[in-house]
Amino acid sequence: MNSLSLELNKEQEVLIISDVENSESIINQVKELSKTVTTSLSKEQQQIQNNFDHVIIISSKPFNSALISMYSNLLKKGGKLSIYQTNENETLVNSGMDFLIGGLVDFKATSNSTYKTIVHADKPSWDTNESSTINIPSTSSNNPWASIEGGDRINENDLVSENDKTSKPATTLDDCEVGKTKKACKNCTCGRAEEENQSKPKLTKEMIENPGVGSSCGNCSLGDAFRCGGCPYRGLPTFKVGEKIQLPDDFLVDDI
């Protein structure tokens, strides 16, 4: 048993399957340390679930991973599957995910002088379909708004002072308090007085005969969308610089 390094007791039922020659001594040692030992399975026994505390596989052939689920079903809750192979088997060593999918956890791979590949995996002591009751302590259903509703309410009228009531809206300050017509006040400091004092250019006959010549912005001929606010050509159609502006016959006719 030293080569297997297993911990068995007289209360355990063990299944041991071996294709290695001269394994009778190992089987006899397992019988001495366990309650019962089974060395082969019939088809009917393969369908029995939760039957063994320990399943031991000793083989010189590559392990068939398709049998993992069958061995897992044969194990009782908390049981162990141990695989001993006389040859190195990297595929088995790296198949931890296959064992997990098959229902086994705590996958471990080792080796010793006798067995080049040793794998152990456990069946959980809990069932994947088990459910348990969780006792959640009851909480008091206090009204979360009670502390707010019970407090003193603020009168919204107290938030407005007398100065706030008599002050004029900011929208009336744009015309310097001279009425709806926007004119510069006597002591204007916003720049409106200077704007009103500027002489706006007027359209002359020369400008119509020879339009756009000497334009400072160069956009006069492009139409109102590109003309300055004080452009004398505003309202006139587009034209070519230096060519007389030709007004259509219905230019001064109201559209309505």
From Swiss-Prot:
Ranges for region Linker: 137-166
N-terminal SAM-like domain: annotated span: 1-136
A GO cellular component entry from the record: mitochondrial intermembrane space
Major subcellular location class: cytoplasm
Biased composition regions of type Low complexity, renumbered to the chain: 131-144
Signal peptide: none
Domain notes: The C-terminal domain binds 2 Fe-S clusters but is otherwise mostly in an intrinsically disordered conformation. The N-terminal domain has structural similarity with S-adenosyl-L-methionine-dependent methyltransferases, but does not bind S-adenosyl-L-methionine. It is required for correct assembly of the 2 Fe-S clusters.
Name of the molecule in the record: Anamorsin homolog
